Regions:
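Alpha/beta enzyme core
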Residues: 1-3
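Conserved, non-catalytic sequence blocks in retroelement Pol enzymes and Pol-derived host proteins
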Residues: 6
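Extended hydrophobic packing segments that form well-structured cores
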Residues: 131-168
Length: 168
């Protein structure tokens, strides 16, 4: 086992568990100062959306690197965000471990051609202007209508997935 994602709920519990395990831990909760202070988790797993865009994500990854805390991306939720994290993963040395991909879970996507496809466990960084993807305007309109009808994804208010899974 390379790492265990969120084996317990809090950083404090992870630090206590650290006393009994050599397995690396990762967490979705974004609290870099606490991670440094407690020595756990070993890596923080987030996405571009949670940091407010590419620039702030790069700043966060650089801070993780400065404090020797690992960084991994979790699924980008859309092809746009996934394209961003593919580019950042290719460009930043500190993003050295495999990142999570949930492309097969996407019911629809807002980029031309639909969700990215894995080929032998690899997704190639999109090429072309900007992030290298084209918007599917019809799919984007459908997603916008769904947002207006249903509101944000349940985890959007928390910055992670924990509560949304517990409520289902």
């Amino acid at each position: 086992i390379q790492w265990f994602e969120e084996p317990v709920e809090t950083y404090e519990e992870m630090a206590a568990l650290r006393q009994h395990s050599d397995i690396a831990f990762s967490a979705h909760a974004i609290d870099l100062p606490k991670a440094v202070r407690l020595g756990a988790p070993d890596a923080i797993v987030t996405n571009v959306n949670e940091h407010g865009g590419i620039r702030r994500t790069v700043e966060f990854i650089r801070a993780c690197e400065a404090f020797d805390v690992g960084f991994r991306f979790h699924s980008g939720e859309t092809g746009i965000a996934s394209a961003a994290y593919l580019h950042l993963s290719a460009a930043l040395e500190h993003v050295r471990d495999a990142s999570q991909t949930l492309f097969r879970w996407y019911a629809d996507d807002v980029i031309e051609g639909g969700p990215f496809l894995l080929n032998n466990g690899v997704v190639h960084v999109p090429e072309g202007p900007g992030l290298g993807v084209e918007l599917d305007r019809k799919a984007l309109r459908c997603c916008h209508e769904r947002y207006l009808a249903d509101g944000p994804f349940p985890a959007a208010n928390r910055g992670g997935y924990g509560d949304s899974f517990r409520k289902r």
